Amino acid sequence: MTFNIIKLENWDRKEYFEHYFNQQTTYSITKEIDITLFKDMIKKKGYEIYPSLIYAIMEVVNKNKVFRTGINSENKLGYWDKLNPLYTVFNKQTEKFTNIWTESDNNFTSFYNNYKNDLFEYKDKEEMFPKKPIPENTIPISMIPWIDFSSFNLNIGNNSSFLLPIITIGKFYSENNKIYIPVALQLHHAVCDGYHASLFINEFQDIINKVDDWI
């Protein structure tokens, strides 16, 4: 996948990038997403919620260059043409998880089938990263289906150059005849401001609301 170099000296975000990158400022935001119609539609069609949420997340990420901006293995700043999800899968027997990546696809059915194939092949492997090699253009996604939460934060102290978003999903719950699911978004301020966090949340909710258009 193509990695497009950003020339920092000519970048309109240069001042902000240098300031927050040197400070190593990251932040997280958690928002309850209304999945009432989404969950009902997914159930009727016979799909699983987790991969359907992953698909919706990747639609937002791959639509917006800001969420694909990072530093590659050659320590170059730039953005990928496309990112793929690297998601956790829990093993009930070992009480551990594996991280599996699946190729992104704009077509939901194609992505879902690829997900199911990868899951079948790798979910029982007792490795943290069973599907190798892992491409650079992946984004971490995980789900904690046992609890709903109002806040969630990750700290990456040993990788100061990781700029991509990290998404964590919680347990869905019912309130006032609506079904919600918490979604935590971890961002690096060097590339993403509060506006971009709001952009992600709003576009994600919009895709969830329009599930009938893509499922």
Curated annotation (Swiss-Prot):
Catalysed reaction, written as an equation: chloramphenicol + acetyl-CoA = chloramphenicol 3-acetate + CoA
Induction, as annotated: By subinhibitory concentrations of chloramphenicol.
Primary enzyme class: transferase
Record's keyword terms, sorted: Acyltransferase, Antibiotic resistance, Plasmid, Transferase
A Gene Ontology BP annotation from the UniProt entry: response to antibiotic
Active site: H189
Subunit (UniProt): Homotrimer.
Alphabetical list of NCBIfam families matching this protein: chloram_CatA
Function: This enzyme is an effector of chloramphenicol resistance in bacteria.
Official protein name in the record: Chloramphenicol acetyltransferase
Native source organism of the sequence: Staphylococcus aureus
Source lineage: Bacteria, Bacillati, Bacillota, Bacilli, Bacillales
